């Protein structure tokens, strides 16, 4: 210890106010009779603490969703195909800021800053050319509104003779997060809620396997929130969306089937596992309060690496950190990872 206090060296305090002991055993706890593992709940049922499905990853492994952020639609299309050949199992398209905010590329300050620019139907035709959309899930964070991207995708698939009802995945909006990030919106929030409701109505009728609300936690995680705050703020946004959709006559079942979450995974291994498990449990209780049936109380979770744990100087270190973050996400029971 070199003269340093035992508690300071051997016990680790986290941002969440939790103190880690140096070692844990089966008898760790206030009482020797405490049980670590839950015995009255199973995966795929109850509050979904232990997972959203009964069989876990035995029937369907977690999705591998490498983000493709090339600026031009043709180059992004080639990258999507390349990633599938390399082992990805999800088409994950990252759009630029202008597209996410509904701004024409000609009027954008920095077109293609973080992803592909999509302005016209021709761009979407190029982006989706040769992609097997009926078999491989599709993922796109659409920014303020999913209606624009949804319409372009549907029109493209129809022109190609594809069955849009077989498309699964998410083309999801998150207008409140965009408002927090940008400080402003190009449309009134009420109009965006109207578009969100229309997206749900259309997909439930025409593409029931496609989700249109994508509530992501990265705006909070990258902004300094701890695990507890990250889950709380993310679910607060989701609750707001539920209430606004109910005002517009959307049934809680349809809302539940339209929601998808994305959480960042950080460096504190056990905290990240606990965060994902707790998130499913908390969300189950929230949906129960809204009167949802048990099958609608689970939440579909996509996980992403926390960027604040990465360095620009050493790729090898980033790979090691990424490995532990992926491991914690998988143990936590995510549906897909980016």
Model-derived features: positions:
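Contiguous, well-ordered alpha-helical segments that form the cores/surfaces of helical PPI scaffolds
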Residues: 151-155, 281, 285, 321-328, ...
């Amino acid at each position: 210890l070199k003269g340093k206090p035992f508690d300071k060296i051997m016990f680790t305090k986290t941002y969440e106010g939790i103190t880690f002991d140096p070692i844990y055993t089966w008898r760790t706890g206030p009482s020797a009779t405490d049980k670590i593992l839950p015995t009255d709940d199973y995966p795929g049922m109850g509050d979904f603490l232990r997972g959203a499905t009964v069989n876990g990853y035995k029937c369907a492994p977690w999705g591998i969703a490498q983000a493709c952020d090339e600026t031009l639609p043709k180059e992004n299309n080639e990258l999507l195909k390349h990633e599938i050949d390399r082992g990805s199992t999800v088409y994950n398209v990252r759009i630029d800021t202008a597209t996410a905010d509904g701004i024409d590329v000609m009027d954008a300050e920095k077109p293609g800053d973080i992803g592909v620019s999509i302005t016209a139907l021709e761009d979407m035709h190029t982006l989706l050319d040769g992609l097997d959309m009926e078999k491989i899930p599709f993922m796109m964070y659409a920014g303020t509104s999913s209606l624009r991207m949804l319409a372009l995708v549907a029109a493209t698939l129809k022109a190609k003779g594809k069955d849009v009802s077989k498309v699964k995945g998410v083309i999801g909006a998150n207008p409140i997060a965009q408002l927090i990030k940008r400080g402003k919106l190009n449309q009134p929030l009420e109009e965006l809620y109207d578009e969100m409701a229309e997206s749900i109505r259309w997909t439930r009728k025409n593409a029931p396997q496609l989700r249109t609300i994508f509530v992501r936690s990265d705006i909070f995680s990258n902004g300094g929130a701890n695990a507890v705050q990250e889950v709380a703020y993310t679910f607060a946004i989701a609750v707001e969306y539920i209430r606004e959709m109910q005002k517009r006559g959307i049934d809680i079942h349809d809302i539940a089937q339209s929601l998808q979450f994305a959480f960042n995974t950080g460096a504190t291994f056990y905290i990240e596992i606990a965060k994902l498990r707790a998130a499913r449990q908390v969300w189950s209780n929230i949906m129960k309060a809204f009167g949802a049936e048990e099958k609608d109380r689970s939440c579909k979770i996509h996980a992403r690496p926390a960027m604040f744990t990465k360095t620009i100087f050493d790729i090898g270190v980033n790979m090691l950190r990424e490995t532990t973050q992926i491991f914690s996400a998988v143990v936590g029971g995510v549906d897909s990872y980016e």
